[in-house]
């Protein structure tokens, strides 16, 4: 009668040893895949298969990595950052002049016509009179002007402009679409940066 109550273990249940083997094999497969991808990436870079030309279309991966890294860095570095320069016509006019001297060659004047260099940049330089950054916090514009953006034509002005002058540029950019009359008159005086197309 004892044999009637005996139960047998299902043969499909994994033992601890089999489970550990499965996990080890799975991890080994992941490591192998990572090594293969790293080697493929190295070969692609070494053989020139990764585009390095400024007029080449970036891959989706490159665009994602660049935008994600930039946005994360700006968000991290601008927390609690506020413009110490008081808004005034005088400070805005200084901002206009600083923009004209340092930025207009790439980002245009009030006519929003791009210069020849601006049309050849990767990424194409936005013409701020029409593709403005008025919606951005001043701290974001300050960060971009001060630090630049890697792998683009946007340079850093850390060594050439004082922080207070960068803040004046940021203030001007923030108010570009609603400038006081005296400031707008100065803005309209900035010479066009428009380039000449090839003949």
Residue ranges and their predicted role:
Residues 182-192:
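Short, flexible loop/turn segments with low-complexity composition
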Residues 90, 96, 100-123, 149-156, ...:
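Periplasmic/extracellular electron-transfer cofactor-ligation site
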Residues 63-66, 112, 133:
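A ubiquitous short alpha-helical element
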């Amino acid at each position: 009668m004892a044999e009637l109550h005996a139960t047998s273990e299902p043969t499909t249940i994994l033992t601890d040893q089999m489970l550990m083997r499965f996990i080890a094999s799975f991890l080994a497969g992941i490591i192998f895949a990572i090594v293969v991808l790293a080697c493929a990436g190295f070969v692609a870079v070494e053989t020139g298969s990764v585009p390095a030309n400024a007029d080449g279309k970036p891959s989706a991966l490159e665009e994602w990595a660049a935008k994600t890294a930039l946005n994360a860095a700006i968000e991290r570095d601008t927390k609690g950052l506020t413009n110490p320069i008081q808004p005034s016509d005088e400070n805005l006019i200084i901002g206009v002049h600083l923009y004209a001297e340092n930025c207009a060659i790439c980002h245009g004047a009030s006519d929003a016509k791009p210069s020849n260099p601006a049309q050849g940049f990767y990424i194409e330089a936005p013409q701020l009179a029409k593709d403005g950054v008025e919606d951005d916090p001043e701290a974001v514009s300050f960060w971009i002007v001060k630090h630049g953006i890697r792998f683009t034509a946007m340079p850093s002005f850390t060594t050439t402009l004082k922080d207070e002058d960068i803040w004046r540029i940021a203030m001007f950019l923030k108010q570009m679409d609603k400038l006081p009359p005296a400031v707008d008159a100065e803005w309209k005086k900035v010479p066009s940066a428009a380039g000449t197309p090839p003949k």
